[in-house]
Curated annotation (Swiss-Prot):
Transmembrane segments: none annotated. It comes from Scolopendra angulata (Barbados giant red centipede). The keyword Disulfide bond applies. This is Scolopendra 20528.11 Da toxin. Disulfide bonds: none annotated. It is found in: Secreted. Expressed by the venom gland. GO terms for cellular component: extracellular region. Contains 3 disulfide bonds. The keyword ATP-binding does not apply. It comes from the Eukaryota.
């Protein structure tokens, strides 16, 4: 996710990153 929104607060960003990382792990695990 290269989207950086000034309107997002840190919590929303952290949640998005967490979801992104989980999805990436899923792909890595097959």
């Amino acid at each position: 996710c290269q989207v950086v929104e000034r309107g997002l607060d840190a919590k929303a960003k952290a949640a998005m990153l967490d979801a992104h990382n989980k999805a990436r792990q899923k792909v890595a695990n097959g």
